[in-house]
């Protein structure tokens, strides 16, 4: 397995320490600054989760282009690529589309777990599977009433359109919906 992305110099030792005893290889483009931190606060009584997401460091365009080049250099050696999460400030909003296109050129399956414009842009490149959570799916694809039946119907429409082979919508404690 391989992990790749931006390695922020201020968080370098933390990242490398985490990888030390893992089976993961990594290839990264180093960027000045610190990795953003995300904190989730869960109130057990009300069952409400509050997210506090920091911005993190800005990634200059030359580093983004260096990452696209790095990704292109190794993607053909992989069977499957997972592209997930938000991207740092400065990273172009069509980054997932570009990376999926590069992977598709090499016959590599892509799983896209993104939200908003990152998800919609990535979908243009026809990933093998998209995996938004319920909120992300409803926000991006606006099923009529947000019911499980409407989510399933809209997911099937997306697959039938040829934009992706499979859609998996995670539903928190209720599990997940998977359609092909």
Regions inferred by a protein language model and the residue ranges of each:
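Short acidic, glycine-rich surface-loop motifs adjacent to enzyme active sites
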Residues: 75-90
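Short glycine-rich anion-binding loops that position phosphate/pyrophosphate groups of nucleotides
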Residues: 55-57, 86-89, 136, 173-174
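Conserved phosphate/ATP/ADP-binding segment of small-molecule kinases
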Residues: 94-180
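Short beta-strand segments
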Residues: 6, 30-31, 42, 53, ...
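Glycine-rich nucleotide/cofactor/substrate-binding loop typically near the N-terminus or early
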Residues: 29-47
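Substrate-binding N-lobe of the ribokinase-like
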Residues: 1-35
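Conserved phosphate-binding/catalytic loop of the ribokinase/pfkB sugar-kinase fold
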Residues: 41-77
């Amino acid at each position: 397995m391989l992990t790749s992305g931006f390695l922020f110099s201020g968080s370098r030792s933390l990242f490398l320490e985490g990888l030390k005893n893992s089976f993961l290889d990594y290839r990264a483009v180093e960027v000045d600054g610190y990795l953003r931190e995300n904190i989730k606060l869960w109130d057990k009584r009300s069952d409400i989760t509050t997210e506090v997401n920091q911005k993190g460091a800005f990634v200059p365009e030359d580093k983004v282009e260096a990452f696209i080049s790095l990704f292109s250099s190794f993607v053909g050696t992989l069977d499957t690529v997972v592209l997930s999460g938000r991207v740092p400030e400065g990273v172009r909003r069509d980054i997932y589309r570009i990376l999926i296109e590069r992977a598709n050129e090499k016959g590599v399956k892509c799983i896209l777990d993104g939200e908003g414009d990152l998800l919609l842009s990535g979908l243009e490149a026809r990933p093998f599977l998209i995996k938004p959570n319920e909120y992300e799916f409803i926000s991006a694809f606006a099923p009529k009433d947000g019911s499980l039946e409407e989510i399933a119907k809209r997911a099937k429409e997306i697959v039938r359109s040829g934009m992706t082979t499979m859609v998996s919508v995670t539903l928190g404690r209720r599990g997940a919906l998977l359609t092909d």
